[in-house]
């Protein structure tokens, strides 16, 4: 049998911290696949998406400002291990092409706007060092590929091998900034606690950790002075124990040339383990590439504070109700009020057939879990997940962020629900990680293991199947209390390709 473990396989499992039971569970997932989720509806206004009035927004902002003064620990959590290589896919293709001058729209746009790039002067110096000519001279001499090689190659700026967080994104008179630096500044504007500390945690890949540490060491003093606060920056790496086994198309072990098993990173869902080790009351989560220059930050900061204010208000009500339930003899009216809070405020529709003697236990179980409030933007056709009301195993219906692969696209009704969804997930979360007694939740307990993904890849010219764990904001938070809030599109400005840096939202105010 091609899934029998050899002695060296068991040694590898032990090194990685993966049990044989976990391995067997992964193999079962390949054999059985993952079920599609049963949809109730796409989330919409009055159906799971909050649209707070201006007056309500002010009340939530005040709630957050008050919370900041009360000594709670707040952390910003930024997944930053992704390599930037996908940003440069079109430029790598240009270097390999059998033509030497820009042909595609993307290539032409890149060279047309190159002078606007935040890394332009660095690239110019690099070209002078490598070729003894500046960018202008190289372009006049039709040496377009040499300019790209100076940007991407290890002998040049090495942008093709660095993580996104370390590339220059935005221009300022006193020095251009990377996304890491933008996150420091942004965090100082909504997550500075009463102790004047700004806590930010970056998840990074092992090979880049030193580069991140160096950037922080070089820049901390400057930004602490600007922000009038102490920067407390920490890092972690995805754990080897969250890697997943690769298999052949027949679900046998995929073995490498030396006969060893192949394990692959389990995707961003693995970061639930990193998040679980964060000691904080409130955690802001945002992707590394979704940052804007200072003149656009006020709107981002406003909505971050709004999400946080909604979260702490909901959390305080939840804690109040849990304490009432602790008192045992809750009145019928109180039980009714708690049920209404769960259904109306936490957007969780309870099953109709709960036995009366079980109701208090069900209400307690629904209340006593991690909580998140997520911003949602208008859907303009971006690839990625969206907000839905979904049936749970216990018959309840709650809010989830789903990817297209979790939805049965062969079912016309479900496909239409996905395609006609009004909102898109920009990865803009504020999370509460402790219970009403101040004890941290054990986050892996709230993952739905049936929400992973199977993807098809290749290695050394051979096809393989890979397993992605339930996504961090998808199935990994499936059993959290979840609330969605409409936020404007201006708060969502990711950089997916190098040309995105030429968009107005990433250019200096006076160059727009």
Where in the sequence are the language-model features?
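Small-residue-rich anion-binding loops in enzyme active sites
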Residues: 1-35
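Domain-scale recognition of functional cores that engage charged ligands
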Residues: 2, 10-18, 39-380, 388-401, ...
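Primarily single-stranded nucleic-acid-binding OB-fold modules
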Residues: 346-372, 381-385, 396-402, 406-512
């Amino acid at each position: 049998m091609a899934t029998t473990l050899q002695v060296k396989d068991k040694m590898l499992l032990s090194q990685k911290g993966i049990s044989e039971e976990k391995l067997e569970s992964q193999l079962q997932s390949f054999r059985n696949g993952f079920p599609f989720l049963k949809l109730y509806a796409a989330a919409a206004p009055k159906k799971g998406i909050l649209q707070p009035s201006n007056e309500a927004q002010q009340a939530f902002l005040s709630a957050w400002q008050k919370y900041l003064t009360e000594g709670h620990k707040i952390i910003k959590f930024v997944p930053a291990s992704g390599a930037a290589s996908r940003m440069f896919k079109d430029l790598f293709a240009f270097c390999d092409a059998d033509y030497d001058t820009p042909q595609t729209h993307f290539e032409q746009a890149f060279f047309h706007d190159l002078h606007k790039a935040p890394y332009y002067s660095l690239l110019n110096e690099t070209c002078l060092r490598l070729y003894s000519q500046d960018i202008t001279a190289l372009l006049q001499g039709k040496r377009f590929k040499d300019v790209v090689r100076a940007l991407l190659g290890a002998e040049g700026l090495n942008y093709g091998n660095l993580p996104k967080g370390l590339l220059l994104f935005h221009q300022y008179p006193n020095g251009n900034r990377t996304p890491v630096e933008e996150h420091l500044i942004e965090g100082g504007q909504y997550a500075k606690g009463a102790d004047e500390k700004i806590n930010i945690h970056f998840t990074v890949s092992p090979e880049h950790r030193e580069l991140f540490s160096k950037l922080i060491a070089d820049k901390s003093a400057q930004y602490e002075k600007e922000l009038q606060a102490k920067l407390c920056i920490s890092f972690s790496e995805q754990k080897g124990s969250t890697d997943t086994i690769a298999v052949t198309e027949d679900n046998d072990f995929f073995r490498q040339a030396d006969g060893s098993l192949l394990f692959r990173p389990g995707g961003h869902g693995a970061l639930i383990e990193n998040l679980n080790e964060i000691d904080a009351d409130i955690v802001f989560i945002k992707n590394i590439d979704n940052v804007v220059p200072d003149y656009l930050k006020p709107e981002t900061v406003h909505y971050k504070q709004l999400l946080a204010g909604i979260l702490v208000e909901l959390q305080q009500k939840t804690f109040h109700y849990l304490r009432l339930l602790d008192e045992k003899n809750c009145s019928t009216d109180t039980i009714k009020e708690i049920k209404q809070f769960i259904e109306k405020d936490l957007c969780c529709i309870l099953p109709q057939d709960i036995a009366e003697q079980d109701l208090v236990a069900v209400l307690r179980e629904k209340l006593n879990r991690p909580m998140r409030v997520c911003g949602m933007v208008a859907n303009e056709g971006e690839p990625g997940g969206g907000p839905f009301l979904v049936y749970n195993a216990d018959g309840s219906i709650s809010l989830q962020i789903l990817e297209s692969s979790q939805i049965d696209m062969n079912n016309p009704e479900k496909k239409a629900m996905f395609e006609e969804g009004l909102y898109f997930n920009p990865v803009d979360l504020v999370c509460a990680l402790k219970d009403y007694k101040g004890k941290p939740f054990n986050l892996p307990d709230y993952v739905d293991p049936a929400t992973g993904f199977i993807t098809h890849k290749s290695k050394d010219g051979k096809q393989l199947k890979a397993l992605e764990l339930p996504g961090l904001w998808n199935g990994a938070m499936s059993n959290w209390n979840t609330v969605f809030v409409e936020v404007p599109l201006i708060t969502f400005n990711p950089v997916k390709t190098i040309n995105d840096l030429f968009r107005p939202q990433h250019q200096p105010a006076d160059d727009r």
